[in-house]
Amino acid sequence: MIFVDTNILYHIIHKTPSTDKALTILEENPGDYVIDTVVHNEIIYASTMHYLEHKHGVKGAYSARKWIKRHGYPKEVIDAVRELIKRLNIRLISSIYTEGELYKVLIEFRLLPSDAIIALTCKHYGINTILTFDGDFKRVPWLKVVP
């Protein structure tokens, strides 16, 4: 299994200057791609915020909540995330960690909570490779960071 981080998916969905690099990373590292519930949440949230800002001028979480309450969840975001997961044949796995493990990894490897959960989930499933532009994962000894 190969873990795909949020930033790789984001650059593919949103056609950024790093899109080609993200696609190349996937092409050069074929395998059984997985994301956990943290990445699934992050890509939906980040894509929603990007969509609302660029299509409707909505900025900030509070304004986004008001917009969604009034107009409903943007189908374009759901469709884009769903299509990418399907196209790349990404499997969704549950995030797994204990409270004690989380605190230990936060402190020992100086990670943000979401990254610590991802690292622990990878450890639990025996995943040793993560595709990401986030250099913080290089501090995690059981993960090989690509690129």
Give short role names for the model-derived ranges.
Residues R82-N128:
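Active-site neighborhoods of divalent-metal-dependent phosphate/nucleic-acid chemistry enzymes
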Residues V4-D5, H11, S94, L111-P113, ...:
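Histidine- and aromatic-rich ligand-binding microenvironments
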Residues P74-K75, D79-N89, R110, S114, ...:
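Internal alpha/beta domain cores that form substrate/cofactor-binding pockets in large enzymes
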Residues I8-L9, V39, I117-I118, D136-F137:
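Alpha-helix capping/helix-boundary segments
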